[in-house]
Amino acid sequence: MPNPTQRFSNRVADYVRYRPDYPPAVVDTLRQHCGWTGPVDIADLGSGTGLSALGFLDAGHRVYGVEPNAEMRQAAEALLSSRQNFTSIDGRAEATSLADHSVNLVIAAQAFHWFDVAAVAAESERILRPGGYRAVLWNLRRTTGSDFLDGYEALLQRFGTDYAAVSERYADSQALALYFGEDGHDVYRFDHAQHFDFEGLRGRLLSSSYAPAPGHSQHLPMLDALQALFDATSANGKVAFEYDTCLYVSTPCRASSALPKPRTPALS
Protein backbone atom coordinates (compact mmCIF):
# COMPACT_ATOMS: atom_id res chain seq x y z
CA MET A 1 0.00 0.00 0.00
CA PRO A 2 1.41 3.46 -0.90
CA ASN A 3 2.74 5.74 1.85
CA PRO A 4 -0.41 7.12 3.53
CA THR A 5 1.11 10.59 3.90
CA GLN A 6 1.50 10.89 0.12
CA ARG A 7 -1.63 9.13 -1.16
CA PHE A 8 -3.59 12.32 -1.83
CA SER A 9 -0.85 14.61 -3.16
CA ASN A 10 -2.21 14.50 -6.73
CA ARG A 11 -5.88 14.65 -5.70
CA VAL A 12 -6.04 17.79 -3.59
CA ALA A 13 -8.14 19.90 -6.00
CA ASP A 14 -10.83 17.22 -6.28
CA TYR A 15 -10.66 16.59 -2.52
CA VAL A 16 -11.27 20.25 -1.72
CA ARG A 17 -14.13 20.61 -4.18
CA TYR A 18 -15.97 17.31 -3.90
CA ARG A 19 -15.43 15.75 -0.47
CA PRO A 20 -18.30 16.19 2.02
CA ASP A 21 -18.32 18.40 5.07
CA TYR A 22 -19.73 17.11 8.37
CA PRO A 23 -23.21 17.60 9.85
CA PRO A 24 -23.38 20.59 12.23
CA ALA A 25 -24.80 18.26 14.89
CA VAL A 26 -21.34 16.68 15.28
CA VAL A 27 -19.88 19.75 17.00
CA ASP A 28 -22.94 20.26 19.19
CA THR A 29 -22.95 16.59 20.19
CA LEU A 30 -19.30 16.80 21.23
CA ARG A 31 -20.01 19.98 23.20
CA GLN A 32 -22.73 18.25 25.17
CA HIS A 33 -20.92 14.95 25.53
CA CYS A 34 -17.72 16.60 26.79
CA GLY A 35 -19.47 19.20 28.93
CA TRP A 36 -17.84 22.21 27.29
CA THR A 37 -19.17 25.58 28.42
CA GLY A 38 -16.92 27.69 26.20
CA PRO A 39 -14.15 27.49 23.61
CA VAL A 40 -11.61 24.68 23.95
CA ASP A 41 -8.33 23.68 22.31
CA ILE A 42 -8.55 20.88 19.73
CA ALA A 43 -5.89 18.83 17.97
CA ASP A 44 -7.17 17.72 14.55
CA LEU A 45 -4.95 14.80 13.51
CA GLY A 46 -4.60 14.23 9.77
CA SER A 47 -6.46 17.49 9.26
CA GLY A 48 -6.13 17.35 5.48
CA THR A 49 -7.66 20.24 3.56
CA GLY A 50 -9.34 21.72 6.64
CA LEU A 51 -12.87 20.41 6.13
CA SER A 52 -13.00 18.84 9.58
CA ALA A 53 -11.84 22.04 11.31
CA LEU A 54 -14.55 24.30 9.91
CA GLY A 55 -17.34 23.42 12.32
CA PHE A 56 -15.11 23.76 15.36
CA LEU A 57 -13.73 27.09 14.17
CA ASP A 58 -17.23 28.41 13.51
CA ALA A 59 -18.13 27.48 17.11
CA GLY A 60 -15.19 29.52 18.42
CA HIS A 61 -12.82 26.71 19.33
CA ARG A 62 -9.07 26.84 18.64
CA VAL A 63 -7.93 24.10 16.25
CA TYR A 64 -4.40 22.85 15.71
CA GLY A 65 -4.45 21.10 12.34
CA VAL A 66 -1.71 18.46 12.20
CA GLU A 67 -1.09 17.29 8.62
CA PRO A 68 2.01 15.62 7.11
CA ASN A 69 1.08 16.03 3.43
CA ALA A 70 2.33 19.37 2.12
CA GLU A 71 -0.27 19.75 -0.63
CA MET A 72 -3.18 18.98 1.69
CA ARG A 73 -1.80 21.24 4.41
CA GLN A 74 -1.37 24.13 1.96
CA ALA A 75 -4.98 23.71 0.83
CA ALA A 76 -6.12 23.99 4.45
CA GLU A 77 -3.98 27.06 4.99
CA ALA A 78 -5.56 28.70 1.94
CA LEU A 79 -9.10 27.76 3.00
CA LEU A 80 -8.63 28.92 6.59
CA SER A 81 -6.26 31.85 6.08
CA SER A 82 -8.70 34.30 7.68
CA ARG A 83 -9.31 32.16 10.76
CA GLN A 84 -7.24 33.46 13.66
CA ASN A 85 -8.16 30.41 15.75
CA PHE A 86 -6.58 27.92 13.32
CA THR A 87 -2.94 26.87 13.53
CA SER A 88 -1.43 24.70 10.79
CA ILE A 89 1.25 22.23 11.89
CA ASP A 90 3.56 20.21 9.68
CA GLY A 91 3.47 16.99 11.67
CA ARG A 92 2.17 13.46 11.96
CA ALA A 93 -0.57 12.07 14.16
CA GLU A 94 2.06 9.96 15.89
CA ALA A 95 4.35 12.98 16.52
CA THR A 96 2.33 16.20 16.60
CA SER A 97 4.98 18.51 18.16
CA LEU A 98 2.25 19.92 20.43
CA ALA A 99 3.13 20.56 24.06
CA ASP A 100 2.28 18.11 26.83
CA HIS A 101 -1.28 18.44 28.17
CA SER A 102 -2.14 21.27 25.78
CA VAL A 103 -5.54 20.30 24.29
CA ASN A 104 -9.01 19.31 25.47
CA LEU A 105 -9.90 17.13 22.48
CA VAL A 106 -7.93 15.00 20.05
CA ILE A 107 -9.97 14.18 16.95
CA ALA A 108 -9.20 12.32 13.74
CA ALA A 109 -11.69 12.92 10.94
CA GLN A 110 -11.53 10.66 7.89
CA ALA A 111 -7.92 9.82 8.78
CA PHE A 112 -7.73 7.36 11.68
CA HIS A 113 -7.47 4.34 9.39
CA TRP A 114 -4.07 5.58 8.14
CA PHE A 115 -2.49 5.82 11.61
CA ASP A 116 -0.18 3.67 13.70
CA VAL A 117 -2.83 3.22 16.38
CA ALA A 118 -0.59 2.36 19.33
CA ALA A 119 1.66 5.34 18.61
CA VAL A 120 -1.29 7.70 18.18
CA ALA A 121 -2.83 6.47 21.43
CA ALA A 122 0.40 7.31 23.25
CA GLU A 123 0.67 10.71 21.57
CA SER A 124 -2.96 11.52 22.39
CA GLU A 125 -2.33 10.65 26.03
CA ARG A 126 0.66 12.97 26.04
CA ILE A 127 -1.05 16.04 24.58
CA LEU A 128 -4.46 15.72 26.27
CA ARG A 129 -5.23 17.69 29.40
CA PRO A 130 -6.63 15.77 32.38
CA GLY A 131 -10.25 14.95 31.64
CA GLY A 132 -9.74 15.45 27.90
CA TYR A 133 -11.44 13.42 25.21
CA ARG A 134 -10.47 11.41 22.17
CA ALA A 135 -12.75 11.24 19.13
CA VAL A 136 -12.76 9.57 15.73
CA LEU A 137 -15.06 10.81 12.97
CA TRP A 138 -15.90 9.30 9.61
CA ASN A 139 -18.28 10.00 6.77
CA LEU A 140 -18.90 6.35 5.92
CA ARG A 141 -20.29 6.01 2.41
CA ARG A 142 -23.33 3.77 2.22
CA THR A 143 -22.57 0.84 -0.03
CA THR A 144 -26.13 -0.31 -0.56
CA GLY A 145 -29.67 1.00 -0.39
CA SER A 146 -30.27 2.29 -3.93
CA ASP A 147 -29.42 1.25 -7.46
CA PHE A 148 -26.80 3.98 -7.57
CA LEU A 149 -25.14 3.02 -4.27
CA ASP A 150 -25.10 -0.65 -5.26
CA GLY A 151 -23.62 0.18 -8.65
CA TYR A 152 -21.01 2.57 -7.28
CA GLU A 153 -19.76 -0.04 -4.82
CA ALA A 154 -19.51 -2.58 -7.64
CA LEU A 155 -17.55 -0.04 -9.70
CA LEU A 156 -15.04 0.46 -6.88
CA GLN A 157 -14.68 -3.27 -6.39
CA ARG A 158 -13.95 -3.61 -10.10
CA PHE A 159 -11.61 -0.67 -10.69
CA GLY A 160 -10.21 0.39 -7.30
CA THR A 161 -6.47 -0.24 -7.16
CA ASP A 162 -6.43 -1.22 -3.47
CA TYR A 163 -10.02 -0.47 -2.52
CA ALA A 164 -10.64 -3.68 -0.58
CA ALA A 165 -7.55 -3.20 1.57
CA VAL A 166 -8.42 0.42 2.36
CA SER A 167 -12.11 -0.18 3.09
CA GLU A 168 -11.30 -2.94 5.58
CA ARG A 169 -9.41 -0.42 7.74
CA TYR A 170 -12.41 1.81 8.38
CA ALA A 171 -14.05 1.53 11.80
CA ASP A 172 -11.93 -1.49 12.69
CA SER A 173 -13.20 -2.59 16.10
CA GLN A 174 -9.83 -3.81 17.34
CA ALA A 175 -8.09 -0.58 16.34
CA LEU A 176 -10.80 1.50 18.02
CA ALA A 177 -10.59 -0.61 21.19
CA LEU A 178 -6.82 -0.13 21.29
CA TYR A 179 -7.13 3.60 20.81
CA PHE A 180 -9.87 4.27 23.36
CA GLY A 181 -8.54 1.81 25.92
CA GLU A 182 -10.32 0.80 29.11
CA ASP A 183 -12.59 3.85 29.20
CA GLY A 184 -14.30 2.68 26.03
CA HIS A 185 -16.30 4.90 23.71
CA ASP A 186 -19.77 5.90 22.64
CA VAL A 187 -20.93 6.04 19.04
CA TYR A 188 -23.27 8.62 17.50
CA ARG A 189 -24.64 8.31 13.97
CA PHE A 190 -25.93 11.10 11.73
CA ASP A 191 -27.46 10.98 8.25
CA HIS A 192 -25.55 12.95 5.62
CA ALA A 193 -25.58 13.22 1.83
CA GLN A 194 -24.24 14.97 -1.24
CA HIS A 195 -26.14 15.35 -4.51
CA PHE A 196 -24.02 15.29 -7.64
CA ASP A 197 -24.37 15.92 -11.33
CA PHE A 198 -21.95 13.89 -13.44
CA GLU A 199 -19.10 16.39 -13.11
CA GLY A 200 -19.44 16.30 -9.33
CA LEU A 201 -19.67 12.52 -9.25
CA ARG A 202 -16.56 12.24 -11.39
CA GLY A 203 -14.69 14.60 -9.08
CA ARG A 204 -15.85 12.72 -5.99
CA LEU A 205 -14.58 9.44 -7.46
CA LEU A 206 -11.23 10.92 -8.46
CA SER A 207 -10.74 12.35 -4.97
CA SER A 208 -10.36 8.77 -3.70
CA SER A 209 -6.80 7.51 -3.45
CA TYR A 210 -7.73 4.09 -4.83
CA ALA A 211 -9.32 5.45 -8.03
CA PRO A 212 -7.02 4.93 -11.05
CA ALA A 213 -5.54 8.32 -11.93
CA PRO A 214 -5.08 9.75 -15.46
CA GLY A 215 -2.51 7.67 -17.32
CA HIS A 216 -3.50 4.44 -15.60
CA SER A 217 -4.78 1.77 -18.00
CA GLN A 218 -8.10 1.56 -16.09
CA HIS A 219 -8.74 5.29 -15.76
CA LEU A 220 -10.79 5.78 -18.94
CA PRO A 221 -12.67 2.45 -18.66
CA MET A 222 -13.58 3.44 -15.08
CA LEU A 223 -14.96 6.80 -16.23
CA ASP A 224 -16.94 5.11 -19.00
CA ALA A 225 -18.46 2.78 -16.41
CA LEU A 226 -19.22 5.75 -14.15
CA GLN A 227 -21.01 7.55 -16.99
CA ALA A 228 -23.09 4.45 -17.69
CA LEU A 229 -24.00 4.15 -14.00
CA PHE A 230 -24.97 7.82 -13.81
CA ASP A 231 -27.10 7.59 -16.95
CA ALA A 232 -28.90 4.53 -15.57
CA THR A 233 -29.56 5.77 -12.03
CA SER A 234 -29.72 9.58 -11.98
CA ALA A 235 -32.97 11.43 -11.38
CA ASN A 236 -33.35 15.02 -12.59
CA GLY A 237 -29.67 15.03 -13.46
CA LYS A 238 -28.44 14.10 -9.97
CA VAL A 239 -27.47 11.09 -7.86
CA ALA A 240 -27.54 10.91 -4.05
CA PHE A 241 -24.21 10.06 -2.44
CA GLU A 242 -25.32 8.99 1.04
CA TYR A 243 -23.30 8.62 4.24
CA ASP A 244 -23.54 7.46 7.80
CA THR A 245 -21.51 10.06 9.67
CA CYS A 246 -20.18 8.17 12.68
CA LEU A 247 -18.65 9.84 15.71
CA TYR A 248 -16.72 7.68 18.17
CA VAL A 249 -15.89 9.52 21.41
CA SER A 250 -14.31 8.42 24.67
CA THR A 251 -16.46 8.13 27.78
CA PRO A 252 -14.68 9.23 30.96
CA CYS A 253 -18.09 10.65 31.84
CA ARG A 254 -21.41 9.66 30.37
CA ALA A 255 -23.31 11.70 27.81
CA SER A 256 -26.44 13.57 28.87
CA SER A 257 -29.92 12.33 28.07
CA ALA A 258 -30.38 15.24 25.66
CA LEU A 259 -27.95 13.70 23.20
CA PRO A 260 -28.82 11.36 20.35
CA LYS A 261 -28.81 7.86 21.80
CA PRO A 262 -25.39 6.24 21.32
CA ARG A 263 -25.54 3.19 19.10
CA THR A 264 -23.20 1.12 17.05
CA PRO A 265 -23.95 1.73 13.34
CA ALA A 266 -24.40 -1.11 10.89
CA LEU A 267 -21.19 -1.00 8.88
CA SER A 268 -20.60 -2.95 5.72
What are the residue ranges of the model-derived segments?
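Tryptophan-centric aromatic hotspots in well-structured domains and transmembrane helices
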Residues: N10, D14-Y15, Y22, T29, ...
